[in-house]
Amino acid sequence: DGYYYPSSGQAASVAECLLMEAKRLGIVIHTDSPVTQVKNKNNEFIAVTSQGEHFESRVLIIAAGSLAGMKEGKLTDPQDFCRTLGLKVQPTVPALTALVQEKDTIGKIWSGVRVQAAVALISDGKCMSKDKGEVQLTDYGISGIPVFQVSRYASYSLLKKKKTEAVIDFMPSMTKNELLEELRVRAGFTDRSAQGQLCGLWNSKLVHALCKKARIAIDRPMRLADCDNLAALAKEYRITITKTNPISQSQVCAGGVDLREIDPSTMECVNVPGLYLTGEVLDVDGICGGYNLHWAWATGTIAGKAAANKIGKQRKNR
């Protein structure tokens, strides 16, 4: 599908490779010393840690990511450092995360089901994004990669207090008419209950949920009239989204420092010389598949080289 992951299937493999290379290069890493404060005094940056340490430099790279995936209240939001230094920051919201639906008894029925489906994110009646793949149905809403891909739009829609909905197509491989014809053929087996007639078409728990929503008795045969309702529902199953999972359960955040604040050729701040920003601190977020990691590494490489060059020039001019 064009996405890149370690063949080990473990994200930790990537981190281990980076740590081994850092060790080889003699890079000193301070652990258990989260930065709590950043100051810019007379063109000198000062980073203060929770251990009371003070690190001073004429060059500072903020590569602290975001609060995504972090336990709430454990770390200082990296965006606060940027605001303190006078940078414009766009509101940060959860992205690549699950969506929570309006309370509905259907969730208890379909919880745990994985299904190939298409998902469209609707904000005040307008389709903002859509994707398809394996959707995970939960007792609280929907999850899975297709849901993650559209979740940033849900976050911003909710932030602006717009009506936010997800429309699910539970049979993306068929048109509505093709599905309707399939259902009519199955309805012809009048000696079976609806559960039996629909056996093999969807997961049995999803069949139960769809029939309940369409007001079809699961223990009785479907009628031809039921087929129209079920086809329409299965192709456009609409749920109201009330919130996303919190930032602590999100893979990344959308939002961050306005890109107009930096020179993209060096990642240096236009109005704060010597300050460099990389990765998720900036107002850039991508879909699943390694894009956010690539952005972090690419901008980190650019910023690292530019910062090193700047330090080299400063030393020569002394």
PLM region spans:
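Short loop/edge segments at beta-strand edges and connector loops
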Residues: 29-33, 91-93, 245
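Flavin (FAD/FMN) cofactor-binding core of flavoprotein oxidoreductases
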Residues: 7-15, 23, 95-103, 244-261
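An anion/pyrophosphate-binding glycine-rich loop and adjacent beta-alpha core
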Residues: 88-93, 98-221
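Short hydrophobic core segments
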Residues: 35-36, 54-71, 82-83, 135-140, ...
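A glycine-rich dinucleotide-binding beta-alpha-beta segment and adjacent secondary-structure elements
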Residues: 31, 207-285
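Glycine-rich loop(s) and the adjacent beta-strand/alpha-helix scaffold that form part
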Residues: 59-105
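A conserved FAD-binding loop/helix module that cradles the flavin
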Residues: 66-81, 85, 284-313
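Feature captures the FAD/FMN-dependent oxidoreductase FAD-binding
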Residues: 1-59, 207, 211
